[in-house]
UniProtKB/Swiss-Prot annotation:
Family annotation (SUPFAM superfamilies): Prokaryotic type KH domain (KH-domain type II), Ribosomal protein S3 C-terminal domain
Residue stretches making up the KH type-2 domain: 39-109
Subunit composition and interactions: Part of the 30S ribosomal subunit.
CC terms in the record's Gene Ontology section: chloroplast; cytosolic small ribosomal subunit
A Pfam match: Ribosomal_S3_C
Organism whose genome encodes this protein: Nephroselmis olivacea
Name of the molecule in the record: Small ribosomal subunit protein uS3c
Family matches, as InterPro entries: KH_dom (IPR004087), KH_dom-like_a/b (IPR015946), KH_dom_type_2 (IPR004044), KH_sf_prok-type (IPR009019), Ribosomal_S3_C_sf (IPR036419), Ribosomal_uS3_bac-typ (IPR005704), Ribosomal_uS3_C (IPR001351), Ribosomal_uS3_CS (IPR018280)
This protein's UniProt keywords: Chloroplast, Plastid, Ribonucleoprotein, Ribosomal protein, RNA-binding, rRNA-binding
GO biological process, one term: translation
Keyword hit for Metal-binding: no
Amino acid sequence: MGQKIHPLGFRLGITQQHRSTWFAPRKLYVSWIHEERQLRDYLKTRLADAGVANVQLTRQSDRIEVEIHTACPGAIVGRTGQGLEILREDIQKRLPKVRRVIVHVVEIANPDAQAVLIGGIIAKQLEERIPFRRAVRQAVQRAMRAPGVEGIKIEVSGRLNGAEIARSEWVREGRVPLHTLRADVDYCDCTAQTIYGVLGIKVWIFRGEIRPVRQVLAPGT
């Protein structure tokens, strides 16, 4: 079960949270979904070099909050903060029905423990024709040096190093318990566009277990 299902969706409500928080009337539900998809695609393209790991959206009837978790906040905010205002205005133009747009930028304290950022580094190296084993080995070493990381697994699929027959290879170091629901497992899948075709990259990072806090009641209560 844990080997097949999506690691993040499997843990929603336990160690993972929804990346969108809103409720829409029945008539607006479809249009809001399309607007969110367009907004996320725009942010993915606009902030491709800003080290964005996650985007949280909170929406009400006439207001939307965009929380961007990034390893390079300066690339978004700019020196004087003007970049953040330009980004907010661009989002406002794409959402004309929303009266107020609020953008928050949150700096990631431990970027090497984020699967999205590790996967992006591997994809960039593969597109620069670096041998996939070297790229994967460097990514594993980089992640295992990050505080809190207890294990990592990386799988690369496709025409590796230009081979005629596509195959899959994976590397794992440490523990990556996919069946344990309380395990804090971060996951991402991305692609690398090479001259030989598209390579698929999957990254699992295990950051320890999150155990619920039990309240001990005093005698007589």
